[in-house]
Amino acid sequence: MMMAAEEGVETPEIGFYEYGKPYFIQPAGWYFSLSHSGEYAACALARKPVGVDIQKIRPVDLGVPRRSFSEEEQQKLRLSNSPEEELIRIWTLKEAVVKASGLGLRQDLRCVNASTGSYKTWKLEDYIVSVYCADACELQDQIKRIFYK
């Protein structure tokens, strides 16, 4: 709401792209992404397409990488001292990238990577959070973490 007020818009107006990704009709020129897991929710706002994902670190099926991860990502997973945490880290980044694209999981996830944009991943208690901004926006310098419980 503060962002809308700064843009001179009383109430934000939201629309949906073809594949269901929400976007701001007003205030124009802003992008957002939402995610939740367990007791946390995450929101990302940017002037470029943006995606965010948060996932709780938990036991996972280590067979997932063969279907969804590139060979390079699978190698990182094999070499990791904490494969479940690394799997969640890679997965949240992939989710953030596909959310920013607006295409969702309709893409071959083995081909999804963050090399054409900016991203930041961090650990919050037992959760991994990844934010991805398309077009290599200045994410690293602008990201602000605000957590409330």
Predicted regions and their residues:
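Core catalytic alpha/beta fold that binds nucleotide/phospho-ligands
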Residues: 1-149
